């Protein structure tokens, strides 16, 4: 029941359940990424993307769950902007940059606080564009097909 590689933490007086949980956690931390994910992680590092393997695993899991890559990117961008504001609060030129984007996204997009990259594009493309065009396109494409069994298009009589 001695600490077998558990590292600094609970000593030999720790309950066996806690020690087993710590060992499982240590094993999980050692193998966070699968072989394919590790290869992708190494490629990302080679491309200059320095990131913790746990964070990379979260990103890969989000993409596996079919979360839109643009949404993941914009969420990371907004999170990094928040960190930049906190860390660069002494620099007067860095603080005004992220602050105008926060009220813009809240004012224009009612539910899209996380999407801070392009509120005008999301407003035009998401609400006005496809929202009005999509019902018109299928109805126009159905007319030449005949409309149903036994019916003929109106121009067939000529």
UniProtKB/Swiss-Prot annotation:
Coiled coil feature spans: none
Positions of modified residues (Phosphoserine): 34, 152
UniProt GO cellular component terms: centrosome; cytoplasm; gamma-tubulin ring complex; spindle
Pfam families tied to this protein: MOZART2
Keyword Phosphoprotein: yes
Compartments (UniProt record): Cytoplasm, Cytoskeleton, Microtubule organizing center, Centrosome; Cytoplasm, Cytoskeleton, Spindle
Cystine pairings recorded for this chain: none
Record region (Disordered): 81-158
Superkingdom: Eukaryota
InterPro entries given in the database record: MOZART2
Record's compositionally biased regions (Gly residues): 110-119
UniProt KW keywords: Cytoplasm, Cytoskeleton, Phosphoprotein
Assembly, per entry: Associates with the gamma-tubulin ring complex (gTuRC) consisting of TUBGCP2, TUBGCP3, TUBGCP4, TUBGCP5 and TUBGCP6 and gamma-tubulin TUBG1 or TUBG2; within the complex, interacts with TUBGCP2; the interaction plays a role in gTuRC activation.
Entry similarity comment: Belongs to the MOZART2 family.
Function, in words: Required for the recruitment and the assembly of the gamma-tubulin ring complex (gTuRC) at the centrosome. The gTuRC regulates the minus-end nucleation of alpha-beta tubulin heterodimers that grow into microtubule protafilaments, a critical step in centrosome duplication and spindle formation.
Name assigned to this protein: Mitotic-spindle organizing protein 2
């Amino acid at each position: 029941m001695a600490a077998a590689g558990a590292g600094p933490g609970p000593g030999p007086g720790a309950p066996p359940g806690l020690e087993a949980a710590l060992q499982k956690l240590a094993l999980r931390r050692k193998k966070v990424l699968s072989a394919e994910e590790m290869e992708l992680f190494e490629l990302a590092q080679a491309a200059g993307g320095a990131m913790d393997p746990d964070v990379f695993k979260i990103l890969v899991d989000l993409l596996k769950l079919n979360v839109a890559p643009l949404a993941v990117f914009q969420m990371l961008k907004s999170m990094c902007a928040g960190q930049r504001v906190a860390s660069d609060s002494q620099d007067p030129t860095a603080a005004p940059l992220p602050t105008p984007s926060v009220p813009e996204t809240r004012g224009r997009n009612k539910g899209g606080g996380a999407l801070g990259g392009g509120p005008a594009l999301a407003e035009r493309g998401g609400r006005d564009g496809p929202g009005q065009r999509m019902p018109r396109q299928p109805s126009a494409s159905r007319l030449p097909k005949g409309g149903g069994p036994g019916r003929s298009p109106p121009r067939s009589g000529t």
